[in-house]
Structures are given as structure tokens and as C-alpha cells.
């Protein structure tokens, strides 16, 4: 049972066949998609507004051929480092596949597949779905044809969701329990870290000892829900632009420009320039980002040539990110990578309300030399 009183929460549960009771001043639910509080209170989850319904299969593998040894004729030039040393995301029809090599050898790999594009295999086992994907994509099969699964592959029947409610008077869910979008850009990490940071700033011993609702919970929950919504909008737009790839690549720059600006501003001690994740706490910047995402989706649906669509999308992204593009991103670039170059930070110091000297000092402070 779950009983909320004015000054505490009482939990009743069974552990190892024994009935136990726990009294807590407050509860922070960090249990992920199987939210314990949601199960206790019967809180329902809802589908996402923008990201298509999807499912996932995944596992850990040994004897995976590195991507550098696979066919790379689609690339214009040699990559700057072995691709398999990064978290590699392969876009496929109706989804994407990840491949993440650990330092000691094994590879974490899996696929996110939309219900609409893969309805015919959704009810199959994880292993059958995985083999189907490999058969459909020879370059992936080339990497995994000798691979051995370390443990039975697993399957998530429904990936994206958001809870109808994420807080009560004395309990709150971390963003990881309140909702999940898609691991495409690993946005779950900053969403949850933001939630932890806000809770850490708001909760004090005297706050927990007092009676009645914890006043900070509604505001924290509202901010987390807003960030979940903009992530959903972003990922949904990326799914809509996966084909052709250059539309997708250009659209990702909305994300990379925003988060690199935020990271730099925060390291400069100027958090007010980029409050929240993806400008979630700045209504003007947030609205600009959302408007760009809407326009991109509209263009993607137009009955025009891919070249015309790409030019329109690139123009929107270029103008949208101009005020916060401090790392030299170019939506019209034909190569799929940008160097780890600090010089754009100096050129764009004014966008960060800073001087080149302040940029230099910040880089030295964090162990980066230029």
C-alpha cells in the first residue's frame, strides 16, 4: 500500500516473503519506466505527442567486426577516428540501430523500430527481430555475422511514454520515471540530471521536516514536463527527417548548437544565458526552437524535390541557430563530421556575453588547452 499523510508517506510491501512497512518524509521515484509510485497509485502512462510509437530489441555481443572494417564507400573521405570507437547510430527505414563498443571488447547493440514501419515483426522474439534487421541491411550483417550474444537478447514492447502525473504532496518522480522519449540523442541523461539538480537545490532538512506539501515539487515537475515535451518534439522531427539523411544531419544541428551553447555558458558561470535544457526556461528561445521544428516537419511533407526541401531546411536551421551557434556548425556541410576545434568559441565570444580572454580562462580551468 501507499499512504500519503501531511508529514510523511507510509509504504507497505513484501520482501522475501515478509511484510514490511516504511515511513518516509518524502519519496523520490528513480525507478525508471517501471515507476514504483505509478504502480502503487495506478497512474497511467500516455503516448508521446510527436515521436512515433516504437519498440526496441537489444543485447551485448562479442566478436563484432569493427565498423571500420565494413564497407564505407558511402563516405566522401576517411573519418577522423575509427567509427567503432564512438557510439555509432545507423539510420534504417523506420528506425535506427546503435552500436557501442566497450573498452574491454564487448559491444552493446540494439534497434529502435517504429510500429508503423515494422508491424509485421513486432510480435516476434528479440532474436528473430534482430536477425531480420541484419538480413535487411548487409553492412550491419557484415559487422555482426560472427557475433555471439553474451546473454539472451531483450525486448521493450513500448519505448516512448509520459506519465499523466509526476508528483504528489510529498513524492515526485525523477524525469527518468516520469517519461521517456528515445535514446537517439541520449537526452534522458540531461533530463534526469536536471531533475536531480533541481531537487538538490530545493530540498533542505527543514523542508522535509515540515508538514504539508513540499512547495518545490509542482515547479520542478512542471519544468521537467516542459523539457520532456521539447525533447519529444525534437526527436519526432528527427524521425520525420531520417530520409534523406542530409535532412536529418542538418536537423540534428538544432540540438548540437543548443546544447554546446548551454554547456559553454554554464562553464562560463553565465547560466542565465541558457536556462534549462534546450532553452526550456527561456520562453523566447524555446518558442524559436519549437517554431523551427514545426517548419521543418511541414517542409518535409511538401510535394517538392529533395534538393528544394534540403535548401529550405538548411536555411531555417542556419537562421535559427545563428544566435547560439558558437562551435562553427554548418547545416549545408556535405561531410558528416566537425572537428573538435576551440577557435569558433573565440570568434563567437560575443554571443556568450564574454571576451576571448574569458573563453581562454574557462578552457584552462577545465583542462582544455588551445
Show where each model-derived region lies.
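Residue-level signal for alpha-helical context at structural boundaries
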Residues: 45-46, 55, 75, 148, ...
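C-terminal helical "tail/cap" subdomain of flavin- and related membrane-associated enzymes
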Residues: 201-370
Amino acid at each position: 500500500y501507499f499512504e500519503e499523510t501531511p508529514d510523511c508517506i507510509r509504504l507497505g510491501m513484501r520482501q522475501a516473503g515478509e511484510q514490511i512497512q516504511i515511513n518516509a518524509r518524502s519519496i523520490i521515484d528513480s525507478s525508471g519506466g517501471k515507476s514504483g509510485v505509478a504502480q502503487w497509485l495506478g497512474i497511467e502512462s500516455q503516448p508521446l505527442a510527436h515521436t512515433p510509437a516504437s519498440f526496441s530489441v537489444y543485447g551485448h555481443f562479442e566478436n563484432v567486426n569493427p565498423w571500420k572494417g565494413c564497407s564505407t564507400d558511402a563516405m566522401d573521405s576517411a573519418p577522423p577516428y575509427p567509427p567503432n570507437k564512438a557510439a555509432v547510430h545507423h539510420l534504417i527505414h523506420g528506425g535506427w540501430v546503435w552500436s557501442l563498443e566497450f573498452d574491454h571488447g564487448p559491444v552493446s547493440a540494439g534497434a529502435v523500430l517504429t510500429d508503423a514501419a515494422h508491424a509485421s515483426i513486432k510480435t516476434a522474439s528479440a532474436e528473430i527481430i534482430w536477425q531480420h534487421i541484419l538480413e535487411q541491411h548487409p553492412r550491419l550483417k557484415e559487422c555482426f555475422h560472427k557475433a555471439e550474444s553474451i546473454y539472451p537478447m531483450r525486448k521493450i514492447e513500448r519505448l516512448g511514454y509520459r506519465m499523466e502525473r509526476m508528483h504528489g504532496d510529498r513524492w515526485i518522480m525523477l524525469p527518468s520515471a516520469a517519461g521517456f522519449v528515445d535514446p537517439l540523442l541520449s537526452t534522458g541523461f540531461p533530463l534526469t540530471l536536471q531533475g536531480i539538480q533541481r531537487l538538490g537545490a530545493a530540498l533542505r532538512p527543514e523542508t522535509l521536516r515540515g508538514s504539508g506539501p513540499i512547495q518545490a515539487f509542482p515547479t520542478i515537475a512542471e519544468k521537467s514536463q516542459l523539457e520532456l515535451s521539447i525533447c519529444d518534439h525534437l526527436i519526432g522531427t528527427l524521425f520525420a527527417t531520417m530520409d534523406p539523411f542530409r535532412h536529418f544531419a542538418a536537423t540534428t544541428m538544432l540540438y548540437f548548437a543548443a546544447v554546446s551553447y548551454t554547456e559553454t555558458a554554464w562553464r562560463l558561470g553565465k547560466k542565465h544565458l541558457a536556462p534549462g535544457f534546450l532553452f526550456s526556461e527561456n520562453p523566447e528561445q524555446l518558442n524559436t526552437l519549437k517554431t523551427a521544428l514545426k517548419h521543418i516537419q511541414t517542409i518535409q511533407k511538401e510535394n517538392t524535390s529533395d534538393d528544394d526541401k534540403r535548401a529550405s531546411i538548411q536555411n531555417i536551421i542556419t537562421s535559427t541557430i545563428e544566435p547560439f551557434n558558437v562551435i562553427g556548425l554548418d547545416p549545408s556541410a556535405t561531410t558528416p563530421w566537425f572537428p573538435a576545434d576551440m577557435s569558433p568559441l573565440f570568434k563567437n565570444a560575443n554571443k556568450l556575453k564574454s571576451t576571448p580572454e574569458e573563453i581562454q580562462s574557462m578552457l584552462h580551468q577545465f583542462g582544455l588547452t588551445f
